[in-house]
């Protein structure tokens, strides 16, 4: 049981690090702690930075057809990737908050570095399609997006990406406080995280690019590979 395990932990650095994990998976009312650990003053700035500094550079490296400045025009509207990508990661993060718990398996402390091994539920991306199917009066809008996506998905990575984000956000009525369900009907912790968080002697936590991408289940591999050795 998570609460019981946390009560047994007396190291203040571990407690401070776990507060960040709590702020994602248990109670997002404390998400300000995550903002602070990334040096952001509000959620909009946090998700913009997450997109521009953490996610986009990885995509630029990986895909030659990626451009942050992509704008998708559809049915008289313009959808800039730089606006809708951060919004997508916001609603996807909202969903993680519905987990209500995570499974803490182990932790290590080396100086100011706290290493956590835990399992957590993950977002069921199929639920975006389920939400889209509820818009009975607007199926032509969604089908059109699928058709557009199929046209470009092989040749233009960022165009494919923005179309997918528009589809997923439209399924949630473009509401930034909306969310989809997690995998499994009840608590189902399928994602294993190896996370590193720096905590100074005053209890101030800092989390770097690779580890925030891991915590929010955006790109888990780099941090998992870097931190896993601490537990072997």
Question: What does each model-identified segment do?
Answer:
Residues 37-41, 136, 225:
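Solvent-exposed, non-transmembrane amphipathic alpha-helical segments
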Residues 23, 115-119, 194-196:
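Ordered hydrophobic segments in well-structured contexts
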Residues 57-62, 110-114, 199-203:
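Solvent-exposed, well-ordered amphipathic alpha-helical segments
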Residues 1-2, 138-161, 176-232:
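Short beta-strand edge/turn micro-motifs at domain boundaries
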Residues 67-173:
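Surface-exposed, charged secondary-structure patches
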Residues 1-95:
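Core segments of small alpha/beta cavity-forming domains
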Residues 33-41, 45, 50, 66, ...:
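Short glycine-rich, low-complexity/disordered patches
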Residues 20, 101, 204-207:
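Broad hydrophobic/π-residue packing in well-ordered secondary structure
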């Amino acid at each position: 049981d998570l609460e019981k395990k946390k009560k047994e932990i007396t190291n203040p650095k571990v407690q401070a690090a776990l507060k960040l994990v709590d702020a994602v998976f248990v109670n997002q009312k404390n998400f300000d702690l995550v903002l602070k650990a990334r040096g952001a003053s509000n959620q909009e700035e946090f998700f913009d930075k997450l997109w521009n500094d953490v996610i986009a550079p990885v995509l630029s490296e990986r895909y030659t057809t990626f451009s942050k400045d992509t704008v998708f025009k559809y049915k008289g509207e313009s959808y800039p990737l730089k606006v809708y990508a951060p919004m997508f990661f916001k609603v996807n993060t909202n969903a993680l908050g519905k987990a209500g718990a995570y499974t803490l398996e182990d932790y290590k402390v080396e100086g100011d570095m706290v290493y956590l091994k835990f399992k957590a539920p993950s977002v069921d991306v199929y639920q975006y399609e389920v939400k889209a199917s509820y818009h009975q009066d607007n199926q032509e809008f969604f089908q059109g997006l699928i058709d557009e996506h199929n046209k470009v998905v092989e040749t233009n990575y960022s165009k494919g990406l923005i179309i997918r984000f528009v589809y997923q956000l439209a399924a949630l009525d473009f509401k930034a406080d909306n969310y989809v369900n997690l995998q499994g009907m009840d608590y189902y912790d399928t994602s294993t995280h190896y996370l590193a968080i720096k905590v100074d002697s005053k209890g101030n936590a800092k989390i770097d690019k690779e580890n925030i991408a891991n915590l929010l289940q955006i790109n888990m591999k780099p941090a998992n590979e870097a931190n896993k050795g601490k537990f072997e």
